[in-house]
Amino acid sequence: MIDQLISELVAYGLENGLIDDADKVYVTNGLLELFQRQDYQEPEKLGKPRKLQLILDDLLEFALSQGILEDDTVTMRDLLDTKIMGILTPAPSVVRKIFEEKYQVSPKAATEFYYHFSQATNYIRTDRIIKDEKWETDTEFGKMVITINLSKPEKDPRDIAKDGTAKKSGYPACLLCRENEGYAGHLSHPARQNHRIIPITLCGEQYYLQYSPYVYYNEHCIIFNKNHIPMAINEITFNKLLDFVKQFPHYMAGSNADLPIVGGSILSHDHFQGGSYVFAMAKAPYEQEFDLESYPDIHAGIVKWPMSVIRLQGRAMDSIVAAANHILTKWRGYSDPEVNIFSDTDGIPHNTITPIARMRGDLYELDLVLRNNITTIDCPLGLFHPHTEYHHIKKENIGLIEVMGLAVLPARLKKEMAELEQAILNHEDLRQNETVAAHAEWAEGWIPKYKITDSNIHSIIQKEIGIVFAKVLEDAGVYKRTDEGKAAFKRFIESL
């Protein structure tokens, strides 16, 4: 049985370009060592090619039966199947050489190769990502994309218990560091033997390109600094983002903000995110245009979007960077008490920007999303943060991906929405149902609008979740889409 499985996996590696015939014996021997086998008889023929995950699952079952896999938990299985795939994964130098050769053909050819490679090695676990729920909701700002993230497995209590007694390591310093390439991992850090990163240069500095293992959108990539240094939004950030889209014009690139609450989950390591995907924000038009006197070659305006966005367009990268830095500098020190915008309190800064860069034909385009992370007694999680009434759907920070119009919602919603569907169809008292009680007030607000049946309830709930997401983005917007908010936004524009 194990000979058959090893032969299947080697055939998969050959078919998907991970290895060639010269590597076949070498890789086979590596797998034999891993599975503690001293004998091997190559099967005369293999059956119909199977999906990678089916082969890996069978190999894991064999490993479990032999005591090679200690515990049958998701974490332990992931550590071992990554080690298995690491044996098939070419050395970094090989992958980088192919990427460079493909880049000479075109940037798109290079990223297409690298993306398919990252899927073939199982670094991107496509079998899990397809479990994510995804749909679109029409709003006045365009089609919002809503996802329920089901691809990140939850920790097994057995692994949590083991991890609690394990010796802690500071290597790699974080999940983004270049030292992850080839790292074996442990209970609290994923294995990365099948991970390969691509060096790129942005404004003379060394960065690396990789894909997100969770791929929230097409070719979702991460561009991270060679060094473990904190996130920062400044003039060089704008320059680097535009330099990236200049080198990869078919990709967009953006940065999370550099302050807590309005930033992403990793503020400790300088990085950007990008990919081959057109977000709803990119499709949103100018709502109001204005002139920047010092930058006459820049087409500037406010974008029709639930958050407060200034868009800059131009042919000269230097002009856009200078204009963006001017706006950032102004915004960092700007207060407007009439609309609760304070640049700092007790010396703690609150204003920052979430920037997004893209090419629009032969024009550079930079969207600057104004952010403020002030908290109040009534809003301890943030004044410009999802309001309490929407926490049953979304209470987490609004980061870069969501700013652009793609919701990443927690896995708990899948079960809760399924129960909500049944409770509504059964005309239950929603407030008496422990699982859906948190959603009761929200659901009671829209149930009367529809003639609900078992054939439309699912799509109705999806639509209403999408509407909530648009509202959540409005909550995160520093200038509300009211007459008062628009007048306040105008005051800031005039200050430029």
Per-region residue spans from a language model:
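Amphipathic alpha-helical segments that form well-ordered structural scaffolds
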Residues: 240-244, 326, 468
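Short amphipathic alpha-helical segments
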Residues: 233-240, 316-319, 323, 461
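Catalytic or ion-translocation cores adjacent to nucleophile or general acid/base/metal-coordination motifs
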Residues: 245-265, 274-326, 332-335
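Helical scaffold of the NTase/Pol beta-like nucleotidyltransferase catalytic core
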Residues: 194-198, 229-253
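Beta-rich nucleic-acid/ligand-interaction surfaces
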Residues: 260-268, 346-352
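Structured alpha-helical segments in the cores of large, soluble enzyme domains
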Residues: 207-212, 237-245, 291-298
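Active-site microenvironments that recognize anionic phosphate/pyrophosphate groups
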Residues: 1-223, 227-230, 304-306, 321-324, ...
